[in-house]
Structures are given as C-alpha cells and as structure tokens.
Design a protein with these regions (language model features):
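N-terminal anchoring/stem segment of glycosyltransferases
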Residues: 1-59, 70-73, 77-78
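Short beta-strand-to-loop acidic/aromatic patch adjacent to the donor-nucleotide binding site
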Residues: 77-87
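Short, flexible, basic/aromatic active-site loop/helix in glycosyltransferases
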Residues: 124-138
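Preference for solvent-exposed, low-hydrophobicity sequence contexts
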Residues: 184-186, 193-210, 215-228
Length: 260
C-alpha cells in the first residue's frame, strides 16, 4: 500500500502548544522511521519541524469543529488519529503498522484501534492480532490511537461536540452506520501514556518524562496536586467491578470524597 494512503494526524490546539516539543521528542525517539506524513492540527500557532506539517482551523471552542476543518485539508484514504498528550513509551514497529493498514483494505474496515482500551468484544477468524469492537460496546469509538478511514471519521464527527461528547455520541452513531467494520488490537501496536488531565500534567507522566531526561516547564503548565494523583489512583483501583459490589451507603460516602 502506498505511504500517502495514510497520514498521521495529531489533534491539538494553540493552548497546548507548550506540549508539542515534548510530544515530538517522544514521538521521534520511539518512531524514528515513521514513513508517513505527519500533520499537527492547531488554530494559528506553528511548530517548526522538517517532518511536521501544520493544519490550521478557525478558533472554535470545541474539538469536533476544529477536527472537521483539519481532516478536510488532508487528502488521504486513512488517517492515524492521535492526541498531543500521548507520549510514546516503546519503539513502534513500522512493519506492524503497515500490516494493520493492509488489513483495513482486506476487510474493508472503517476503523482499527491501535490501543486496546477497551479490548475487542470478540475475535476475528484467521486474525489473531485483532478483533471486532461490536455494536453497543462502551467506548466503541474513542480518541485513542486509531487508524481511521478518513471519510468514516468525518462522517461520525458532529460540529459543536467536545472531545468527550464525540467519544460517547460517535460510539452510538457508529452502531447504525458502521455495524461490523470497527476493530481493535488485543495488544498495543503503539504504546504510550496520557500526560495531561484537566489541563495539568499528571505527576506520573512527569516521573516518566524525567527518566527520559525531559523536564517540562511547570511555569507554563502546572502539575496536578498530590491529592489529585491519589484520588485518581483510588478511583482506578475502585473500578466498576469493585463499585458494583459495594453497598450503596459506602459508595455514597466515597462519592463525597472522590466524585465518582
């Protein structure tokens, strides 16, 4: 398959421009042989790098309207969608990405998720590495790293929706429009961690970046508080299976403290 059939689209906007140098430092460290054209979406700001082209949009207040403008400027069959705070943490196998891209054509898929969150609902005959994200699955579509058929992604986005509204509503819309053509991997094809939450650095991300010799300027973007980190850890530990067996009065007490 021709390399210009897939472009990498990093969705972002100007308020997150302080993250771009760090994102691309991690990106090119772990995917140094990326053969695909890379696009960075913003509003007006630019990022100067020989391997990165800019996509500009009007100053919309929502993710979806910006994404529509960005994606409409890309002329490719497929796009690999990522967000600007996905910090790559392991070397990307370019041959594996190319093989997964071939499966998009072979099985006429509209989306192939490269990070298993959530895992596929069921397997695919003859394909041990990918499975189906079935209709009705929670977060069937989201903004984790995914190879999209560009026209399908544009079809699922609605102007005015926030990123989180897109993830919820596009999953519902995809049930009718793309019932059997959304798949995902069982193991990460691209390994990364999310670095930003509610506009602040995750402390865990800062520790990982420090091991890489990367120290973000916290005067530009602060870190979450230790309390917020602890709360997130507890909420993650108290996952849905645990919450389901807790008595109501215990859940109500926990909700007061941890907002879940």
């Amino acid at each position: 398959m021709k390399k210009n059939n897939l472009f990498v689209y990093i969705s972002s906007f100007d308020d997150y421009s302080d993250i771009w140098p760090i994102f691309f430092q991690c990106f090119f460290k772990y995917w140094s042989d990326c053969p695909y054209q890379i696009y960075l979406g913003s509003v007006r700001k630019k990022f100067d790098h020989s391997q990165v082209k800019m996509l500009h949009a009007n100053a919309h207040s929502n993710w979806s309207s910006r994404a529509i403008e960005h994606l409409s400027q890309i002329k490719s069959t497929y796009v690999l969608l990522m967000l600007e705070d996905y910090m790559l943490s392991k070397k990307v196998n370019t041959k594996e990405i190319a093989s997964l891209l071939e499966l998009m054509d072979t099985y006429d898929l509209n989306a192939l998720r490269l990070y298993p969150d959530p895992l596929p609902s069921r397997g695919m005959s003859g394909q041990p590495n990918i499975g189906f994200q079935d209709m009705g699955q929670l977060n069937r579509t989201n903004t984790h790293a995914t190879i999209w058929r560009r026209e399908a992604l544009l079809d699922l986005i609605r102007p005015g929706e926030s990123l989180w509204e897109f993830e919820i509503n596009a999953s519902i819309r995809s049930n009718n429009t793309y019932p059997g053509s959304i798949c995902g991997v069982w193991k990460p094809a691209i390994d990364y961690y999310m670095a930003i939450g509610k506009g602040k650095w995750f402390r865990s991300a800062l520790r990982k970046l420090a091991k890489e010799g990367i120290f973000p300027d916290l005067s530009l973007r602060p870190a979450e508080t230790p309390y917020t980190e602890l709360k997130s850890f507890i909420l993650k530990w108290l996952g849905k299976p645990v919450r389901a067996i807790l008595p109501l009065h215990v859940r109500q007490q926990l909700k007061r403290f941890f907002s879940f």
